[in-house]
């Protein structure tokens, strides 16, 4: 079993090797460890030159990127890996807790597994890797709860609406958001009204409320 572990904290490498060795005692293991996206891409390309592939990859989202390849973080790296090695099992390991970010990771990357680090103990990782290898999808409890909460609001499940909220939280003006999304200001305001109605909040509390709920 050829395993890629990509994380900018090298201290996690040995524990994760142990998790895999425990989960798959009857397999031979070959580990490749990298601390940034550039190293990861180089290892993926090296494997391809040998007509080989990774069987399993653990990827942290918050890693230094590789600008030359337009890969800015672990999320972009996961997309790249999915394109280059579609049969490789992917497991996203992250400290991110924001609802929107986790929702987008699940929807856009469709990893075989995704976990918030604070949810997981050693036995949880071992069980997760076993399930994923058997073809199951794994999500840790926080991921499940936050994704389900977004699905509970049809308005928030819309990607454009989530982008609008994120832009507002980052201080964008309505005109700037309209330009960014190539929509009219009237359309943006209508969407904001729907968002407020769905969340049962008013004009003065929208940003405070979405931050309080952990959406952004």
Locate the predicted segments by residue.
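Helix-turn-helix DNA-binding segment
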Residues: 148-189
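Residues within the DNA-recognition helix of helix-turn-helix
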Residues: 128, 191-194
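Conserved phosphotransfer microenvironments
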Residues: 54-81
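A short, hydrophobic beta-strand element within the central beta-sheet of small alpha/beta folds
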Residues: 77-103, 114
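Basic, Lys/Arg-enriched C-terminal extension of HTH/homeodomain DNA-binding domains
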Residues: 196-216
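Short, flexible helix-to-coil linker/hinge segments that flank and couple to helix-turn-helix
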Residues: 107, 111-113, 118-155
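Two-component/phosphorelay signaling modules centered on CheY-like receiver
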Residues: 10-35
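Acidic, metal-coordinating helix/loop segments flanking the phosphotransfer/catalytic sites
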Residues: 33-56, 66
């Amino acid at each position: 079993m050829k395993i890629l572990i990509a994380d900018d904290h090298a201290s996690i490498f040995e524990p994760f090797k142990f998790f895999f060795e425990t989960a798959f005692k009857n397999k031979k293991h070959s580990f490749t460890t990298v601390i940034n996206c550039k190293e990861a891409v180089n290892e993926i390309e090296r494997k391809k030159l040998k007509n080989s592939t990774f069987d399993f990859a653990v990827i942290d989202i918050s890693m230094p990127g590789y600008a030359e390849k337009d890969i800015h973080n672990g999320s972009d790296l996961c997309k790249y890996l999915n394109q280059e090695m579609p049969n490789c099992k992917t497991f996203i390991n992250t400290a991110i807790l924001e609802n929107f970010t986790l929702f987008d990771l699940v929807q856009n990357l469709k990893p075989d597994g995704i976990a918030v680090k604070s949810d997981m103990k050693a036995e949880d990782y071992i069980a997760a890797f076993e399930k994923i290898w058997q073809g199951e999808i794994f999500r840790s409890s926080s991921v499940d709860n936050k994704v389900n909460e977004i699905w509970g609001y049809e308005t928030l499940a819309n990607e454009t609406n989530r982008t609008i909220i994120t832009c507002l939280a980052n201080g964008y003006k309505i005109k700037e958001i309209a330009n960014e999304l190539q929509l009219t200001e009237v359309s943006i305001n209508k969407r904001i009204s729907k968002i407020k109605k769905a969340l049962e909040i008013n004009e003065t509390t929208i940003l405070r409320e979405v931050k309080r709920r952990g959406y952004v």
